[in-house]
């Protein structure tokens, strides 16, 4: 399991062990990966994130056109594996969970444990501090510092 934010790791690990999920990807609605488990190659992670974000965006737009509220989850059932996509709100913005699970578990259990993980993530998420705008006299120094951090110089 890999998580970019340390506060994501414990809820994700609990979900993995309780749900028996084979693969899980947590991402922003723009497809930026926050955490993943079970993927072996980075290209798989990036492809799954892009496709998952696009599917959620298209189903939310379809719901809007139909005059319905957003769908809580989208589940694709297969013979050996199934997939669930679910978008949810966090203090850090709207995120998407993509979960792949096998026949050893049920959709209902995956959804139950997923909802518990979401509640834990919402509780654990640090509240973002409002960003202060740079003062004109500090602008050049702050820009230089930001560029050095970004490019590692």
Language model regions located:
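Acidic, low-complexity cytosolic segments
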Residues: 1-21, 30, 34-153
